[in-house]
């Protein structure tokens, strides 16, 4: 089925409490508002039938809806009446007291086209709901190819990634979230990294029974305002631009006119097809049972002093300058220094890899001589093995080259490169390091592999091509994997280097000692370098904090990934 050229999509934002009948009426009212705005598709929030708060399993089952019951029949009737596609998320009875959190799609004739169960549950949802046992196919409609997911599914990468790889043009995300970083990070990054549209509908108003707001706030030290839906429902373009956003605190419907076909061209500015260069054969660990592949126990330092060093000179002249700067910062205590991609090549471009090997070796020798006090330098340089030229993230110490991680994904910008065959890690006195050279960091699977392998720190010597890489992409690599990250690039129109570290207090609904709860779910501490030319940028990161990946009870950001539903990620998929 061919998508129409322009589609008006809408996200409806409203509150849903304990009264199923009132929530039902609210759904119908907001659908009517979307229809008044001439929407072709409207997405409603998660748990539109009842607040996600239950006395026990019996209560959870009682307030859930039947797929063929009156609640959803009325939604379908509204779809037919308004000639409108609708996505609504409800708790659904599955028999024998089993309940799922399910997104249901109706077409403009009122027919139910899909029912997609939530893959990643958070906190107490695990006590009452069954997570998805199968994936929901992409749905071909006259509007385009639609994929459905819900809230926590999008806080980590696997569910949206699988939908995009299966061909979705538009991802419909129903949320029930207090988290301020949904709108600022987790929603827009899924559009950009997959080059698809995202229509995300969140709630406003209390997420728990109003009578319990003050008692729960007192018991958990979570301010009452963060027990409400964070709103900011939004529609995001494939380049990560937020086209429209609702306010935080009131009912609203937001609209945008989009061309779903724009999501089908996956080429980056240099001509690289971001999906075609994927390496599913390398991603197998993502689809393996975490219980059968536990992260090895290890010790990591509480703190690590890091620095990004960028040259003012270009080409071969940058080697001496950078060596002097490395000597300075390592003598002053920097333990890990990361340099921009191909820092000693004009414009970050290698025109002749054979000559590039020679210049890279000169750089390695100079940097080794500059390393002080046991420090290491990560640089992006030309390496050679088995007849292959590589673009590698190299780790250099006082004794010279210690280790190299070849770039894993082909890039038109570095057409001379033969990609490597695995993501590996390097153990250092302060912890475990992974390096993503070239454009590897735009692929969420690469950082995921690093986290599964037990890395605490991720070094990224790179050159961005798209604004989202610095705005949300690298931040999400840190957030969804609970990794410290040091990203080095030449300052330019898209931004400059950044460093992320992790909060000590992290797990929601546990006692926090070092800071008050701020409404962020997994957003790391981000320090950005000045956008103007700055030779040295210093920061402190906390490797040991990467060991806690439990964002809420029974919800581990890495071990809790939907590994059993990852076939679209680990097998070559069509996205034509």
Short names for language-model regions:
Residues 10, 87, 147, 199, ...:
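Structural detector of well-ordered beta-strand residues that form the stable sheet scaffold
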Residues 20, 25-115, 177-196, 213, ...:
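Cys-nucleophile CN-hydrolase/nitrilase-fold catalytic domain and related Cys-dependent amidase chemistry
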Residues 89, 174, 201-202, 380, ...:
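Generic beta-sheet signal
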Residues 49-50, 66, 74, 79, ...:
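Ordered, small/hydrophobic-rich secondary-structure cores
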Residues 2-17, 296-316:
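Short beta-strand segments enriched in small/hydrophobic residues
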Residues 8, 87, 102, 135, ...:
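Conserved beta-strand and immediately adjacent loop positions that scaffold enzyme active sites
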Residues 137-140, 203-303, 425, 491-576:
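C-terminal beta-strand edge segments of enzyme domains
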Residues 65-67, 93-170, 175-185, 189, ...:
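Active-site catalytic loop in hydrolytic enzyme cores
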């Amino acid at each position: 089925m061919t998508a129409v050229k322009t589609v008006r999509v809408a996200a409806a934002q409203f509150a849903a409490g304990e009264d199923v009948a009132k929530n039902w009426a609210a759904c119908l009212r907001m659908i009517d508002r979307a229809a008044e705005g001439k929407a072709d598709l409207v997405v409603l929030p998660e748990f539109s039938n009842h607040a996600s708060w239950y006395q026990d399993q019996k209560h959870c089952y009682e307030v859930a809806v039947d797929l063929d019951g009156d609640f959803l029949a009325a939604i379908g009737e509204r779809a037919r009446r308004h000639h409108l596609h609708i996505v609504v998320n409800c708790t659904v009875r599955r028999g024998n007291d089993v309940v799922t959190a399910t997104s249901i799609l109706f077409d403009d004739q009122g027919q139910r086209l899909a029912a997609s169960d939530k893959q990643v549950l958070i906190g107490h949802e695990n006590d009452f709901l069954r997570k998805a046992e199968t994936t929901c196919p992409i749905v071909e409609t006259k509007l385009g190819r639609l994929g459905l997911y819900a809230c926590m599914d999008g806080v980590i990468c696997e569910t949206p990634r699988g939908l995009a790889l299966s061909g979705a043009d538009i991802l419909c995300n129903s949320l029930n979230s207090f988290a301020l970083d949904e709108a600022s990070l987790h929603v827009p990054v899924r559009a950009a990294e997959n080059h698809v549209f995202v229509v995300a509908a969140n709630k406003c108003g209390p997420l728990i029974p109003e009578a319990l707001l003050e008692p729960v706030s007192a018991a958990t030290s979570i301010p009452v305002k963060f027990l409400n839906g964070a709103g900011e429902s939004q529609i995001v373009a494939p380049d990560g631009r937020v086209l429209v956003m609702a306010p935080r605190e009131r009912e609203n419907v937001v609209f945008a006119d989009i061309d779903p076909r724009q999501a089908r061209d996956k080429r980056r500015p240099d001509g690289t097809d971001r999906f075609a260069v994927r390496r599913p054969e390398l991603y197998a660990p993502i689809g393996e049972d975490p219980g059968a592949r536990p992260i090895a126990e290890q010790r990591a330092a509480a703190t690590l002093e890091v620095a990004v060093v960028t040259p003012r000179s270009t080409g071969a002249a940058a080697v001496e300058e950078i060596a002097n700067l490395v000597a300075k910062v390592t003598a002053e205590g920097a333990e890990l220094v990361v340099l921009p991609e191909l820092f000693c090549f004009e414009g970050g471009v290698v025109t002749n890899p054979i000559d590039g090997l020679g210049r890279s070796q000169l750089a390695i020798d100079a940097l080794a001589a500059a390393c002080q006090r046991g420090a290491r330098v990560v640089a992006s340089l030309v390496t050679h093995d088995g007849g292959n030229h590589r673009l590698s993230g190299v780790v250099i110490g006082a004794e010279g080259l210690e280790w190299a991680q070849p770039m894993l994904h082909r890039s038109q910008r570095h057409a001379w490169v033969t990609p490597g065959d695995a993501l590996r890690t390097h153990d250092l006195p302060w912890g475990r390091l992974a390096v993503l050279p070239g454009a590897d960091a735009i692929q969420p699977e690469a950082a995921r592999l690093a986290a599964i392998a037990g890395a605490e720190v991720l070094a990224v010597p790179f050159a961005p091509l798209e604004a989202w890489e610095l705005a949300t992409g690298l931040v999400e690599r840190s957030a969804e994997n609970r990794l410290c990250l040091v990203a080095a690039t030449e300052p330019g129109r898209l931004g400059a280097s950044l460093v992320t570290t992790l909060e000590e207090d992290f797990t929601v609904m546990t006692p926090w000692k070092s800071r008050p709860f701020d409404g962020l779910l997994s957003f790391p501490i981000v320090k950005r370098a000045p956008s103007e030319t700055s030779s040295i940028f210093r920061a402190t990161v906390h490797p040991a904090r990467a060991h806690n990946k439990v964002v809420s009870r029974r919800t581990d950001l890495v071990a809790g990934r939907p590994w059993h539903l990852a076939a679209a990620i680990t097998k070559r998929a069509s996205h034509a």
